Each structure stands twice: as structure tokens, then as C-alpha cells.
């Protein structure tokens, strides 16, 4: 068994689409909409990891359209202190072919730029190196 957190799910168990992960396992987060003011609601997380009290969040999109206003606002606010960094990747999740990436850090969103999966991995490794060198509650920069 792999030590990595690999998605193990068979959407076709019981027939085509009968065991769809989104239907069977994702919470219906829209039921909480009435708990928040001003149209605010939960969003899903594509990926998140923590090392030495630093978080790296993966936001995966299938096209280069701008992130939604609420997402950008949240990511900028959560990244202000340097504890959370966001990597925005554009690509095909089925094939893992990446076309673009960008970052949000210290409240600043970069523009998307052409990238490959290897570029994304390199950026993640840069973040890991800095996070591993970090002393608790001292913001990192990359």
C-alpha cells in the first residue's frame, strides 16, 4: 500500500456512474448557505497541505477564466500573514496536463503564466524547502 493519499474510488461500481464520488461522498455544502451573510458560502478545497504551521493550498481550474471574486478575496486575506500560500493551476485534471499557473501570497495574486506539471512540482518543492526552514510564526516568502 502506498504511503501517499491517492484517491481510491470506482465511480462505475454498480453500473456506469452509479457510485459517483461527487454524489456519494462530497457533502452538499449548499445546505449551509443560510448560515452565512451576504451570499457567502463554503467552497471546496482541491488540495491542502501543512508543514511547520505553513499551509499550501491547491486551486485547480480547467480554464484560464479569472477566479471568482469571493475566492480571490478569501485567498488574499488568508495569505496576508504568510502562513498560507495558494498555487492556482490551470489544466486537465483527468490527464494532469497543466497549461498555466499562478500564486497568491502575502495578499498578492500573480498573473497566470504558461506552465507544465513539472513547473508546478518545482514551485511546490520551493514552498516545501521554505516551509521546512521556517521557524514557527515567522512568515516565509517565495
Residue map of PLM features:
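Domain-level recognition of nuclease-like catalytic cores that cleave nucleotide substrates
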Residues: 4, 8, 14-29, 91-142
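Hydrophobic transmembrane signal anchors and adjacent membrane-proximal interface regions, especially
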Residues: 6-9, 31, 72-75
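N-terminal first-folded block
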Residues: 14-50
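Catalytic cores of nucleic-acid endonucleases
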Residues: 34-42, 62-110
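Conserved catalytic cores of phosphodiester-cleaving nucleases, focusing on short active-site segments
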Residues: 47-49, 54-63
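Alpha-helix C-cap/termination motif
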Residues: 50, 78-81, 130, 134
Amino acid at each position: 500500500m502506498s504511503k501517499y493519499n491517492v484517491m481510491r474510488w470506482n465511480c462505475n461500481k454498480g453500473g456506469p456512474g452509479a457510485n459517483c464520488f461527487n454524489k456519494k461522498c462530497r457533502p452538499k455544502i449548499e445546505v449551509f448557505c443560510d448560515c452565512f451573510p451576504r451570499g457567502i458560502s463554503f467552497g471546496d478545497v482541491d488540495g491542502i497541505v501543512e508543514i511547520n504551521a505553513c499551509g499550501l493550498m491547491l486551486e485547480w481550474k480547467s480554464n484560464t477564466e479569472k477566479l471568482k471574486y469571493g475566492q480571490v478575496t478569501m485567498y488574499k486575506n488568508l495569505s496576508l500573514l504568510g502562513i498560507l500560500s495558494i498555487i492556482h493551476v490551470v489544466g486537465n485534471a483527468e490527464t494532469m496536463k497543466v497549461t498555466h499557473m499562478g500564486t497568491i501570497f502575502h495578499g498578492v495574486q500573480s498573473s497566470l503564466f504558461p506552465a507544465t506539471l513539472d513547473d508546478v512540482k518545482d514551485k511546490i518543492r520551493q514552498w516545501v524547502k521554505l516551509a521546512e526552514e521556517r521557524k514557527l510564526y515567522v512568515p516565509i516568502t517565495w
